Amino acid sequence: QVFDQACKGVYDRAIFKKLDRVCDDCYNLYRKPYVATSCRQNCYSNLVFRQCLDDLLLVDVVDEYVSGVQIV
């Protein structure tokens, strides 16, 4: 599922796919179902999503992802 109905911001399919990919990659890294679920909670505005960015070595583009979270 690309779109989370709980998100109240702008619906932008490209941004959702990008944020969702982080959660998918993080799940593939750890293979724990709760990782994927927790990562998507609160429209990606949570500590698990931020930790996934770190774990996937995306720290140099964190601001880009954070601004995406703020849009959705």
Curated annotation (Swiss-Prot):
Keywords: Amidation, Carbohydrate metabolism, D-amino acid, Disulfide bond, Glucose metabolism, Hormone, Neuropeptide, Pyrrolidone carboxylic acid, Secreted
Disulfide linkage: 7-43, 23-39, 26-52
GO biological process, one term: neuropeptide signaling pathway
PTM annotation (Valine amide): residues: 72
Record's subcellular location: Secreted
Main location: secreted
Entries under Pfam families matching the protein: Crust_neurohorm
Modified residues (Pyrrolidone carboxylic acid): 1
InterPro entries documented for this protein: Crust_neurhormone_CS, Crust_neurohorm, Crust_neurohorm_sf, Hyperglycemic, Hyperglycemic1
Function field: Hormone found in the sinus gland of isopods and decapods which controls the blood sugar level. Has a secretagogue action over the amylase released from the midgut gland. May act as a stress hormone and may be involved in the control of molting and reproduction.
Record family assignment: Belongs to the arthropod CHH/MIH/GIH/VIH hormone family.
Protein name stated in the entry: Crustacean hyperglycemic hormone B
Species: Cherax destructor (Common yabby crayfish)
Source taxonomy: Eukaryota, Metazoa, Ecdysozoa, Arthropoda, Crustacea
